Regions:
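NAD(P)H-binding glycine-rich loop region in Rossmannoid oxidoreductase-like domains
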Residues: 35-101, 113-115
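Rossmann-fold NAD(P)-dependent oxidoreductase module
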Residues: 15, 19, 97, 131
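Active-site Tyr-X1-5-Lys
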Residues: 117-137
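SDR active-site strand-loop-helix element
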Residues: 6, 30, 73, 106-111
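Conserved glycine-rich Rossmann-like NAD(P)H-binding loop of the short-chain dehydrogenase/reductase
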Residues: 25-32
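Residues that mark the start of a beta-strand
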Residues: 1-2, 105
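N-terminal Rossmann NAD(P)H-binding glycine-rich loop of SDR-like oxidoreductase domains
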Residues: 3-25
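A short helix->loop->beta-strand "cap" motif at the edges of active sites that frequently abuts
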Residues: 100-105, 136-137
């Protein structure tokens, strides 16, 4: 399979990258800063790295259309007062571009939720989940 992996520079994404490659997949790693991403030489033949920003829809044309699945592991860890809005913009842009590819599966890592008592952080994760669920994958 050809799999798109966002969040490849994060802990979970970097661990998942190794698992996906070990299983024989070709992985397209999306990173905001290519200089911060240094995969081991042993897997470089199985990956493609593209630099883009899901807040900038003009960069998203770099995503290949022939992907089979996509992992959404992005998360805004910024202290910005509008991080919830930024996360929603990323999710909407992701949904739109992935819906235009051959991907049949989107895997999202959210959080454990108690919908009766959500922190601002978890409410944001829930909003991202709802946005991604609107996609046609």
């Amino acid at each position: 399979m050809k799999i798109l992996l966002t969040g490849a520079t994060g802990y979970i994404g970097f661990q998942l990258l190794h698992t996906l490659v070990s299983a024989g997949n070709r992985v397209v790693c999306c990173v905001r800063d290519i200089d911060r991403f240094s995969p081991p030489e042993s897997i470089k033949d199985s990956i493609e790295t593209i630099q883009l920003d899901f807040l900038d829809s003009d960069t998203l044309s770099r995503i290949p259309e022939d992907i089979d699945a996509a992992y959404y592991l992005m998360h805004s860890m910024s202290g910005s007062a509008n991080y919830q809005n930024l996360e929603l913009i990323c999710a909407e842009n992701f949904r739109k571009i992935i819906s235009a590819t051959a991907a049949e599966h989107v895997i999202y890592l959210g959080g454990i939720l108690n919908e009766n008592n959500l922190s601002a952080h978890l409410a944001s994760r829930k909003a991202v989940e709802s946005e991604l669920a609107k996609g046609t994958y």
